Every structure is written in structure tokens, then in C-alpha cells.
Amino acid sequence: MKERINQLLQEIGQCVAATVEEAEALRIKYLSKKGEIARLFDDFRLVPSEEKKQIGQMLNELKNKAQEHINSLRERAQAGSAQASAETDLTRTSYPTRLGTRHPISLVKQEICEIFARLGFSIADGPEIEDDWHVFSSMNFAEDHPARDMQDTFFIEHRPDVILRTHTSSVQSRVMEKTQPPIRVICPGRTYRNEAISYRAHCFFHQVEALYVDKDVSFADLRQVLLYFAQEMFGAETKIRLRPSYFPFTEPSAEMDISCNICGGKGCNFCKHTGWVEILGCGMVDPNVLDNCGIDSKKYSGYALGMGIERITNLKYRVKDLRFFSENDLNFLEQFKSVH
């Protein structure tokens, strides 16, 4: 293990990057959750107990030096790019002014909110920089749950109990702490996870979660709301199905699929010839969550559901690459001028 650490430390120290993209490739190779350093941390459990302290210090030092070196490479690459931009001919004729248009994520977010508003849901908002209690503990996440791992969550360096929220469930927690049932809210917002950026994943994305708490709320109520939402969003012919799943904050839990809106449920490459496409997770609110937030779980019940806005936008407008939503490419964004 020591030889592997020293070898990797030397290898990283020799890395160079001429562009920001090359620096990002190095970060993914060495620092992502499936990278070289993560694999060493996985193997740490095999180290003899008498060597764990020394090896642990070496691993932490390796990770810190790798982050410093790759960040330095990124900053130098950015500085070089800025210098090149500064050499642009300032006497050159400017581009004509263009009128802006609404972003596709904003369009879909508004449509989702309008659908739930027709069902009597109000909109709730909360901070993006959150504490551990509202993001994890109140939502019934165990202390050793993988979502708490630094590979998945952005922690504040000097305040490990302060994080960037990984889901908008934290807003549900805050609403339940301050409001007694009946509660009927949706919680749209931006969330963050420590993911390598690719066509199907990003370090930030947008969610809408819904919460309904009252007396005698049942899974049948949830299913009817899901069917209404799917048909309003994707068309009256849309069918839904629910599959058993697991989430810490709901019990029972399910994932919802809709009939593929491209092939009409007949089967195509987009739906992998199943005729179904997954769009959201849902379930009955776990009694522990209600109790954590000061609501009597013996008196009240509720349901919750959550979806990624990017996922819904992908399906609605058939966008195959998540990166398009954050790259500010006018050729892409102007395609939505006619969408209202």
C-alpha cells in the first residue's frame, strides 16, 4: 500500500494540463469517486490494524496534494485562457444585441409548479447552504448512510456540519417544523452533489419535491396525483406504473415509470425497448420523519415525491446531454424561443 501511495504521489506530481478540460480529466482520473485515490481508500480496510494510522495519514496527504496540484493546474490553464482573450482586437465590430429567452429548465419548472398549483399545492423555498440535520438526520438518514460520504456531498471545509443541499427534502423538513398539518407544498430548487460532469450527470441540478401531510392520507391518493401529473405533463394517453424501491425518508417507497412518450410504449432505443421510462421517486412519509419534525405520526400520515427537472426536460424536449443546460450555448437555448 505504501509503495502504491508513493508511486501515485509521484505520478500526480508529474501531471501537466494545458487546458481546463485536461485539468478536469485529471480530476476525474484521480479524485472522482471511482478514481485512483478512491480505490486506495476502498483498499484501506485491508490494511493491518497496526499500520492503519500511518497509512491513513499517507492517504489523506496524497488526496490533499493531488487536490492542490490539480487545482493549481486548473488555475494556470484558466489564466492562460484569460490572457488569450485579453489579446482580442477591441476595435472589432460588436455582435448585434439579441433578446433573451426563458431557459428550458425554467420553462419546465414553471409548468410543473402550475400543474401542482391546480391540485392545491403552494410553493416553499429554503436555503441551498444547509445543515446536516435538515438534509440528512431529520430525513431518517443513518449516520453511516453513503449519501453522507464526502464523495457525494459538498461539505464546507471548516464546518463539516454545513453542506450544500443534496436534495430539496430539506425544505420539507423546515416546512414541517414550522407548520402543523394539513401541509400541501412543492419545493423546487437547485441541489448539489459531488459528481463528475458527463452527459448524464452534473455537480448541480434542479429538483421539485412535493409533500402532503394530513389525516388518513393513503398511497391511493399519491397514485392519483402521480397519474394526473404524468398526463398533464406528457399527454392524456400517458400511462404510469409503480415499482417497489427504497428511500430513507419514505416507507413504502416506489419509483414511477411512464409509458415512453417517443414510441408510445411500443419499445424503442430511448426506452431500451421496454416501453417505459423512469421519471421520479415517491412513497409514504416515514413516521420517523414526521416525529423528527414535530408532527404526531400516530395522528397524521403523508406522501412525498421528488423528480429531477433536467430529467423531465430531457423527456419532454428529447435533450440527450445534461451539459447543454449549463453551457449557455445560444444555438441550443434559442430553440426554446417559441415555447411558452
UniProtKB/Swiss-Prot annotation:
Its cofactor is Mg(2+). Binds 2 magnesium ions per tetramer. It comes from the Bacteria. The lineage of its organism: Bacteria, Pseudomonadati, Bacteroidota, Bacteroidia, Bacteroidales. It catalyses: tRNA(Phe) + L-phenylalanine + ATP = L-phenylalanyl-tRNA(Phe) + AMP + diphosphate + H(+). Keywords: Aminoacyl-tRNA synthetase, ATP-binding, Cytoplasm, Ligase, Magnesium, Metal-binding, Nucleotide-binding, Protein biosynthesis. This is Phenylalanine--tRNA ligase alpha subunit. InterPro entries: aa-tRNA-synth_II, aa-tRNA-synth_II/BPL/LPL, Phe-tRNA-synth_IIc_asu, Phe-tRNA_ligase_II_N, Phe_tRNA_ligase_alpha1_bac, Phenylalanyl-tRNA_Synthase, tRNA-bd_arm. It is found in: Cytoplasm. Tetramer of two alpha and two beta subunits. It comes from Porphyromonas gingivalis (strain ATCC BAA-308 / W83). PROSITE patterns: AA_TRNA_LIGASE_II (PS50862). Its EC number is 6.1.1.20. The keyword Disulfide bond does not apply.
